[in-house]
C-alpha cells in the first residue's frame, strides 16, 4: 500500500481548488511530515502537534477516507 503522503500528493495544485489541495501543498513543504506512514494515528498525532497550516482536522479526515477507499480496492 502506498503511503498517505504519496496518495495526498495527487491533490497538489498551484492554485488550490479546495481544502484538500491546500493541505497537499502544505504537506509537500512540511519536511517533518511522516512521508512513509500508512497509519492514521501517527499522521493525526503529527498534524495535531505540527499541522498549523491545516485549518481543520476535518480536512485530514476527509482526505484519509478517500485514501482508504481508493487504496483498499
Swiss-Prot record:
Pfam families: YozE_SAM_like (PF06855)
UniProt-listed InterPro entries: UPF0346, YozE_SAM-like, YozE_SAM-like_sf
Sequence similarity: Belongs to the UPF0346 family.
Entry-linked NCBIfam families: PRK13672.1
Protein name, as recorded: UPF0346 protein BLi02292/BL01432
Lineage of producing organism: Bacteria, Bacillati, Bacillota, Bacilli, Bacillales
